[in-house]
Amino acid sequence: INCCQIDLTDLFRRGFSTGHGFLREPQSIQSAAALSCIAIQSNQNDMHGGQSIPMFEYDLAPYVVKSYNKHLRQVIKIVLRNDNIDLDDLKAAIEQIYKDNGTALADHTQEQIAVLVKEILRSKFEGDELEDNLSYTMSEALKLTNRETYQAMEAVIHNLNSMQSRAGAQVPFSSINYGTGTTAEQRMIMKNVLLATDAGLGSGETPIFPVQIFKVKDGVNTKEGDPNYDLFRLACKVSAKRLFPNFSFLDAPYNKQYYVEGHPETEVAVMGCRTRVFGNDYDKTKQVIPGRGNLSFTTINLPRLAIEAHGSISKFYESLDRMVNMVFEQLLDRFEIIADKHVYNYPFLMGQGIWIDSYRLHWDDKIRDVIKNGSLSVGFIGLAETLVALVGQHHGESQSALELGLNIIRHMRELTDKQTQKTGLNFSLFSTPAEGLSGRFVNIDKKIYGIIPGVTDRSYYTNSFHVPVYYNISAADKIRIEGKFHELCNAGAISYVEMDGDLNKNIDAFERVVLYMRDCGVGYGSINHPVDRCPVCGYVGVINDVCPKCGRKDGEGVTIERLSKLGVDCICRG
């Protein structure tokens, strides 16, 4: 199985085992953060692709309240200089306030809690002294909770860049989705994960994991006055410095069709660098995100089909149909192999109820029925080179090439939709990342067909439907062109734009680009830009020849560290 979206809320409430002992529900945000990493690591050991937490702030918010409850009672004991005071009633009252209101840290619930605390403090203080100690107690508890939440988010980032999985081969390929939670607790989580990302790793390095996806939603975070607009601005600022978060757009029509207000499990999420699993033709009552994932995908080398068509579009389509049908057969074979497995073959994914409906199965049961909620995807690579081989231009160069490109991808989507209707399984179309295949396919084709200008004359085929990176085009035009393809690729797609200069100094421009992606129908997008780091003073930003902070020249001692998301992408598998 490729990748999965983990429901931490359900997992934490039940408690879970990694095979070496049972872990009960966490009682603080720090322990919840630690267990989230353990869940990702354990699930990764059963799979080869990405692990995603689709509702990060929703899942962890209850544990912010648990930490707050502890901190408040501890501060009261310190203020009263009485470690033995019984505060169980206060603990229960805060739990009830959270249950009734969905928040304990909002202004109106803080007022309710302050009334309770004031009565407790009245046993020792009165008048102005009572008011001063009440103010201190309430503010100090919030301060301690915020500090612990920051440390918890910092730990998530550090752990997911250091803890090993899959027999120690590599760190888990993790991603977290957030952006729409509006309670004080949810906002505290999002703010602090962004601040921890901004701070970087131990020596200031840019963290690669988890891949972070900020969910953009009109009325929630896209304009002044929206409850989370400040967090969207912060996300833009952090992404301008650290490359993450990326941005997913919940109002894209093909995402919005599943959205139910008040149900975050219906908000589209991303696994890894682009994978998307949402629609569910096997069981339309389970068109939700948590507990589902991609079973397998296979990528088609479109440029080879175009080369062999020798300019004949009809021959290309004939070859494409044969190839897609071959992939269908291969994916069905793959499905049968997976379906024949038992729960014990996936001790965490299935044994601990991560995968949807797997909690109904026994240890020796086969997993055939539950995996039908997953997806089987047909991927593709090199649309740009395909168009050059067929008509002499790619889709960034002419409108006619763009129309042909859209027709090709639309045709592939129609084939996957028909296969879904035929089999009852969730077949989908995937704009494959193909970090390895992009070089492998073109090298094989060079040996067979030689150097063909615009097709095999580079060391790679262009990613999925992207306009080639070497082609001189404005960011707006690239977004506008690629945005037309996103709705066709229901298994996932991403669009990048490459920006020059130090975006830290122009967050307004960064924001405009993100929102233009939204306006052009992009479902998932990212802005790529140079990120340099001075190894001497730790400055992060654009460094030409001289570090603007310490004045060190490149080449003096240790070389300046350079990172771009094009380099980061080569690790993507989800």
For each predicted feature, which ranges?
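Contiguous, well-ordered alpha-helical segments that form the cores/surfaces of helical PPI scaffolds
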Residues: 376-389, 410
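Conserved catalytic cores of very large enzyme subunits
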Residues: 1-373, 393-394, 398-573
